[in-house]
A protein has these predicted regions:
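Positively charged n-region of N-terminal signal peptides that target proteins for export
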Residues: 2, 6-7
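Generic amphipathic alpha-helical segments used as scaffolds and interaction surfaces in large
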Residues: 180-183, 198-202, 206, 271, ...
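Short, charged, amphipathic alpha-helical segments
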Residues: 206-214, 275-281, 411
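Individual transmembrane alpha-helix segments
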Residues: 233-249
Length: 508
C-alpha cells in the first residue's frame, strides 16, 4: 500500500518489459542446428561454372549480403539454410548491407543495414523499380540473389545425364528436366528438398541429416568421374574456414605503425632493435608467411591454376612476397621489419575490397598460361620492392633533419633495392610481351596497362643514373622522388584495373 512500494513495483514491471523487449530484439532468427547445417554445406553444387562444396556458395552468399562470412555467430551454412527454410523470420532481419546513402534513402532505412521487407512499400511495390546507377544496382542484385536462394533456383545440386546428348548437367529443384529422364530420378530431383523442408518443420533433425546424406550419395553416383576428388573437396572447405585475412591485416598494420614509430625513435638515438623485439617481429613475419603460403597453396590446388589470375589473388601474392623479402633482408637491415608489416597488411586490406574479391573460378583459356604466372610473379616482386623503397623514402624524409646519417643510410638501402626491383619489372614486362604474342599474335599494343608499366619502368630507372643526374645524390630529393614515383605503381595497378579500359582490365 505504500506509495514507495507501488513506484518500486511499477519500475520493476517496466524494467522486466524492457529486458524482455531487448531479449526479443536480440533473438536470432530460426535456422538449422550447426551440425545439420554442416551436412547441407557438405553437398556438392554447380556454382560459378564449377563443382564445389555448397559451403562455398553459402559463404559467398553471406559475404554478399552482410559483408562478413558470419552473421551474429551463425555459420554461412546456417545463414543460407535460414533463408531457405525460414524465409518469414529472415525477411525481417536487418542484415542486408546497403553501402550507398542514395539506396538507403530509396529504401527508407536509417542505418547501413536493411531488411528484405524494406525493399517493398506498404502496397507491396518494389522501391528500387526504375532506379538507375551502380548503388541501386548493388542493392537490387542482393534482393534478386535472396530470391534465387529462397526459391531454390541457385542450388543446382542435382546432377543428371541428359539423354539427348549424354552430357552431365546440373539442375535445381525448380528447373525443367528432359522428358526422357527416368521418372524416379525426376521425382527425386523435384521432391527431395521439399521433403527436407517438411522434416525441418517437424524439427526432425536426424531425418534432415539423413536425407541430405542421401542427396550427397546420389550426387556422387550420378556425377561419377566429373566430381572433384575428396581431397580437393576437403581442401576447399578448409580454405573457407581459414579465411582470417581481416584480423591478420589489422594486426600487421598496427604492428607496422608501432614498429615504424619505434624504429624512427631508435634511429634518431642511434640504437637498434633489442634481440627480444627483433625475435618477436621476425616470428610474426614467419607466422604470417606460413599462413599465406597455406592459403595460396589451397586456393591454387582448389582452382587448378596458380593463384595470380585476378586482383584478389595478386594482392595476396604481393603480401606473401613482401613477407618473404622481409625475412631475407631484415637480418641485414632491421628497420625494414615495420615496412614489411605495413606493406603486407595494406596488401591484404586491398585484396578484401569489393572490387578485388572475385570468387574462385575456372580460368579463361588465354589466362591459363605459365607465361602469365611468371609475368605476374615478377611484377608483384617488383611492386613489393618498390613499396619498400617508398616507405624508406617516408622514413628518410621524417629523419632528414634529426638524423642525416640515417637518411643517407636509407638512401643507400633504397638504391640497393631499386636494382632488383627495376630488373624484375623489366623482366616482367618482357615476359608479358611474349605472353601477349602467344595469346593475341602481337608483342605490344599500347594498351593502357602496357603504357603505364613502361612509364613506371622509366620513372624508376632515373634514380639508378645518379652519375648523370646529380639531384639523385641528395638524400632528401631522392626520398621525395621515391615517394612520388610510387604513384605510377598505383596508377598502373589500380587505375588501369579498375578505372581505365583495355585488355588487362578484366583481370582485376
Amino acid at each position: 500500500r505504500s506509495p514507495a512500494l507501488r513506484k518500486a513495483a511499477l519500475c520493476l514491471v517496466l524494467c522486466t518489459a524492457a529486458v524482455q523487449g531487448a531479449r526479443a530484439a536480440d533473438t536470432l532468427p530460426q535456422t538449422l542446428p550447426r551440425e545439420v547445417a554442416a551436412e547441407l554445406g557438405d553437398l556438392y553444387v554447380y556454382y560459378n561454372d564449377r563443382i564445389c562444396p555448397l559451403q562455398t556458395l553459402a559463404k559467398d552468399f553471406t559475404v554478399k549480403l552482410c559483408g562478413k562470412s558470419r552473421y551474429r555467430g551463425l555459420t554461412p551454412e546456417q545463414v543460407l539454410s535460414g533463408w531457405l527454410f525460414y524465409y518469414d523470420d529472415w525477411k525481417r532481419e536487418p542484415m542486408i548491407r546497403i553501402r550507398s546513402a542514395g539506396a538507403r534513402r530509396l529504401l527508407e532505412v536509417g542505418g547501413r543495414y536493411a531488411r528484405l521487407s524494406d525493399f517493398r512499400n506498404r502496397v507491396n511495390e518494389y522501391r528500387l523499380e526504375g532506379a538507375a546507377g551502380r548503388p541501386a544496382g548493388e542493392a537490387d542484385e542482393k534482393f534478386n540473389i535472396i530470391g534465387m536462394v529462397c526459391t531454390g533456383s541457385m542450388l543446382r545440386i542435382f546432377p543428371y545425364t541428359d539423354p539427348s546428348d549424354s552430357l552431365l548437367r546440373w539442375a535445381s529443384q525448380v528447373d525443367g528436366l528432359p522428358r526422357e529422364l527416368p521418372h524416379g530420378q525426376a521425382l527425386f530431383i523435384g521432391r527431395a528438398m521439399n521433403y527436407v523442408s517438411e522434416l525441418v518443420v517437424k524439427r526432425d533433425w536426424a531425418g534432415v541429416a539423413g536425407v541430405l546424406r542421401k542427396i550427397r550419395s546420389y550426387q556422387q553416383k550420378e556425377g561419377g568421374a566429373h566430381m572433384p576428388s575428396g581431397l580437393r573437396f576437403r581442401a576447399e572447405k578448409l580454405y573457407n574456414r581459414l579465411d582470417w585475412s581481416l584480423p591478420l591485416a589489422a594486426a600487421f598494420i598496427l604492428t607496422g605503425i608501432g614498429g615504424f614509430l619505434d624504429a624512427c625513435r631508435r634511429m634518431v638515438r642511434g640504437r637498434a632493435f633489442g634481440a627480444k623485439t627483433r625475435g618477436w617481429l621476425l616470428a610474426g613475419v614467419a607466422a604470417g608467411g606460413l599462413y599465406l603460403t597455406l592459403m595460396l597453396a589451397l586456393r591454387g590446388y582448389v582452382s587448378g591454376h596458380w593463384p595470380v589470375s585476378n586482383g584478389y589473388e595478386t594482392m595476396r601474392f604481393m603480401a606473401w612476397c613482401t613477407l618473404l623479402l622481409t625475412l631475407l633482408f631484415a637480418r641485414r637491415f632491421l628497420f625494414l621489419l615495420p615496412f614489411g608489416y605495413l606493406i603486407a597488411g595494406l596488401s591484404l586490406i586491398v585484396s578484401m575490397m569489393g572490387e578485388s574479391n572475385p570468387q574462385i573460378t575456372q580460368l579463361m583459356p588465354v589466362l591459363d598460361s605459365p607465361l602469365l604466372c611468371i609475368h605476374v610473379m615478377l611484377v608483384m616482386v617488383a611492386y613489393a620492392l618498390l613499396a619498400f623503397v617508398m616507405f624508406g623514402g617516408v622514413a628518410g624524409v621524417v629523419l632528414h633533419r634529426r638524423a642525416r646519417g640515417a637518411a643517407a643510410q636509407l638512401q643507400a638501402v633504397s638504391r640497393l633495392m631499386l636494382y632488383p626491383a627495376v630488373f624484375c619489372l623489366a623482366a616482367g614486362i618482357f615476359v608479358g610481351a611474349v605472353w601477349a604474342n602467344v595469346s593475341w599474335g602481337r608483342y605490344w599494343g599500347w594498351d593502357p596497362k602496357e603504357v603505364w608499366a613502361l612509364v613506371t619502368l622509366l620513372v624508376y630507372a632515373l634514380p639508378l643514373h645518379a652519375g648523370s643526374l646529380p639531384w639523385f645524390r641528395r638524400p632528401l630529393f631522392f626520398h621525395w622522388f621515391c615517394i612520388a614515383a610510387f604513384l605510377s605503381v598505383l596508377v598502373t595497378y589500380f587505375g588501369v584495373n579498375f578505372l581505365l579500359g583495355g585488355m588487362h582490365s578484366y583481370a582485376g
